């Protein structure tokens, strides 16, 4: 979708309907007619991105592997999703806080609530198997999603301060390993550490 490409190119969610129309080759009036307004288009884009990513969560939860293995796969999946859609958290914040209550309710319904529910179920599975310490799902969500957002959005501040470059495939892989170590080091029990090791 042209809107997604523009936000990635510009590292910003500040795009206009005319920018989107020009990028897509469509008429701006047609874009407005189909989505209602820019916020409608952004909501549809986020819903499309979220549907793809969230459908994988049910599949992951059903797999016959340890909760620790599921956790690691989830960490990698979330980071890769942010790598593909680096504007995602900014778009979520915009739609939750700077648009209508209806848009905020929709984002909560199709993104925040299902992801939190997945975290609750995964953490409960790990706790009941003895792999995880008791972990608050809201704090877990905040930690993982916040860390992902900062890598992609906060990268601009880091590049100015330290000279680091853009997020590449290698940086993404390093960050996945780092977050696995950080999160697993915080919530795994000895049984969970044994499951992670082998």
PLM-predicted stretches and their roles:
Residues 1, 13-14, 34-58, 72:
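An amphipathic alpha-helix adjacent to DNA-recognition modules
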Residues 9-13, 64, 85, 129:
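Short coil/turn segments at alpha/beta junctions that flank glycine-rich nucleotide-binding fingerprints
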Residues 44, 58-88, 137-144, 173-176, ...:
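Hydrophobic alpha-helical connector segments
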Residues 55, 80-118, 139, 165-172:
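Short secondary-structure transition hinges
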Residues 6-40, 44:
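Helix-turn-helix
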Residues 2-7, 183:
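Short hydrophobic clusters on alpha-helical segments that form packing/core surfaces
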């Amino acid at each position: 979708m042209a809107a997604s490409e523009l936000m990635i190119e510009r590292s910003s969610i500040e795009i206009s309907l005319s920018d989107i129309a020009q990028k897509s080759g469509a008429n701006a009036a047609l874009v407005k007619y189909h989505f209602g307004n820019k916020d409608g288009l952004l909501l549809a884009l986020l819903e499309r991105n979220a549907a793809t990513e969230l459908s994988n969560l049910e599949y992951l939860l059903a797999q016959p592997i340890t909760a620790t293995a599921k956790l690691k796969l989830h960490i990698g999946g979330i980071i890769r999703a942010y790598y593909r859609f680096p504007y995602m958290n900014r778009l979520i914040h915009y739609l939750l806080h700077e648009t209508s209550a209806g848009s905020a309710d929709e984002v909560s319904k199709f993104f925040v609530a299902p992801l939190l529910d997945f975290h609750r179920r995964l953490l409960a599975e790990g706790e009941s198997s003895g792999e995880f310490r008791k972990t608050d799902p809201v704090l877990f969500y905040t930690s993982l999603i916040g860390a992902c957002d900062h890598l992609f959005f906060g990268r601009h501040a880091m590049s100015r301060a330290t000279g680091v470059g853009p997020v590449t495939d290698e940086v993404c892989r390093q960050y996945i390993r780092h977050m696995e170590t950080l999160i697993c080091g915080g919530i795994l029990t000895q049984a969970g550490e044994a499951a992670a090791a082998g």
